[in-house]
């Protein structure tokens, strides 16, 4: 559906869940894909195979911590050299450590901020020069419905996701003159490992809040990301595209 | 490196970054007024010069580098 022929994409947190589905969706469009992952080797190998089978001309795994700025700079350099340029960046890597605010530990707050928000910043800064030089590029940040709504038990996670919206809009303004577009996708409740942990009763209750009356799939989100990353979205920048079944409008 | 060398290299960088012909770049040329640079171009120029000459150009100094001459002066006085 979307044409990424001749393009290279870097997807963070690509070994599982939404990130994996995004990597596959971009590969289906003909993109070469760099898959970042934090440490789950088995899942990463599986994701790589799916991406290759989906039709990526070239695909490669890159294990690094997005919270480490030096590692991000190095990774971007490596991807450009290995896969021929870098045209699409998808900041998807994220962690959630749910706790009521009075019980949030400093290290959990800091780690969520580092991975979810600083990680996206690190890579955005690193890709800016190659994309500006190429006079074009697309960055898609994965935020969340809770970044706009808030959620009890997710003060830190929601704060990082709200922060990503500010990052998205600011960088969209900075880089627009170079035809680098920056957008965000805000998923609602999606069936992934992250939400599988929820008790059944909680899931049923959630579904009542969703007009489309089901949890989303990783593919639902991946399709929205692929659109924003593609040339079909050439006049879209600074946008937050909600993919939530209507639970927040 | 002589001042003439620095000047030539600075001109190369400017030509590359801004996509202008080297013959259009005079020592007195202002990046913004004469060479059509915008704020992003200036940041890119500063970063390219930092890399080429292995000098650090702090933001508050970069603000004062407005012409080719300013850049050459800064580099020749700060280069190790």
From Swiss-Prot, chain B:
Modified residues (O-(pantetheine 4'-phosphoryl)serine): 39
GO BP of this protein: lipid A biosynthetic process
A single GO molecular function term of this UniProt record: acyl carrier activity
Main location: cytoplasm
Protein origin, superkingdom: Bacteria
Keywords assigned: Cytoplasm, Fatty acid biosynthesis, Fatty acid metabolism, Lipid biosynthesis, Lipid metabolism, Phosphopantetheine, Phosphoprotein
Post-translational changes noted in the entry: 4'-phosphopantetheine is transferred from CoA to a specific serine of apo-ACP by AcpS. This modification is essential for activity because fatty acids are bound in thioester linkage to the sulfhydryl of the prosthetic group.
Compartment list: Cytoplasm
A single cellular component GO annotation: cytosol
Domain Carrier: 4-79
Pfam families in the cross-refs: PP-binding
Listed pathway(s): Lipid metabolism; fatty acid biosynthesis
Family designation: Belongs to the acyl carrier protein (ACP) family.
Biological role stated in the UniProt entry: Carrier of the growing fatty acid chain in fatty acid biosynthesis.
Cited NCBIfam families: acyl_carrier (TIGR00517), PRK00982.1-2 (NF002148), PRK00982.1-3 (NF002149), PRK00982.1-4 (NF002150), PRK00982.1-5 (NF002151)
Protein's recorded name: Acyl carrier protein
Source organism: Anaeromyxobacter sp. (strain Fw109-5)
